[in-house]
Amino acid sequence: MSKAIIAKKEKLVDDFAAELKEAKAILVIDYLGLTVEEVTNLRKDLRDANVKMKVIKNTYLKRAAEKAGIEGLEDTFVGPTAVVYTADAEDITEPARIVSKYEDDIDALSIKGGMLEGKVASQEEIKKLAAIPGREGLLSMLVSVLQAPVRNFAYAVKAVADSKDE
């Protein structure tokens, strides 16, 4: 193999290691059996959420993970593997939510494992995380809970005012 090809592969591994090092959430998925249309739709939804998906050879992935200091995911780097990751600390649940939605709809897609904020997460933990509403949903729930007493008081005052009018 020529030195130029080796240098190109080393650069690919180094670049991917840098991206993995910055990632707050990493999911390793098996995409075998997905149609081109399904992969395209998945990538589009991930891109819209500021999440990246990369299909990379397992040997390169192992080297990149090693360089990034990621341990505990090596057993997931088997067979057809894609890595879904985000460096966005705003909502680390978003990749899990999107991939889990596709996993429910498409039998061919499966989550192998992942890492969330530096901690290895099993397939079950990722599915539980995906069930939690996103930041927007949680904020709207909080606002609703905070508004409830004020709203109930306003209804009570209105009911008293209506009863006095009659």
From Swiss-Prot:
**GO annotation (BP), single:** translation
User: Any one cellular component term from GO for this entry?
Assistant: large ribosomal subunit
Single GO molecular-function term? Answer: structural constituent of ribosome
Query: Cross-referenced Pfam families, in alphabetical order?
Result: Ribosomal_L10 (PF00466)
Against InterPro entries, the record matches this protein to: Ribosomal_uL10 (IPR001790), Ribosomal_uL10-like_sf (IPR043141), Ribosomal_uL10_bac (IPR022973), Ribosomal_uL10_bac_type (IPR047865), Ribosomal_uL10_CS_bac (IPR002363)
Q: Which UniProt keywords apply?
A: Ribonucleoprotein, Ribosomal protein, RNA-binding, rRNA-binding
Q: Which protein family is named in the record?
A: Belongs to the universal ribosomal protein uL10 family.
Q: What does this protein do?
A: Forms part of the ribosomal stalk, playing a central role in the interaction of the ribosome with GTP-bound translation factors.
Summary of subunit composition and partner proteins: Part of the ribosomal stalk of the 50S ribosomal subunit. The N-terminus interacts with L11 and the large rRNA to form the base of the stalk. The C-terminus forms an elongated spine to which L12 dimers bind in a sequential fashion forming a multimeric L10(L12)X complex.
**Name of the molecule in the record:** Large ribosomal subunit protein uL10
Which organism is this protein's natural source? Answer: Lactobacillus johnsonii (strain CNCM I-12250 / La1 / NCC 533)
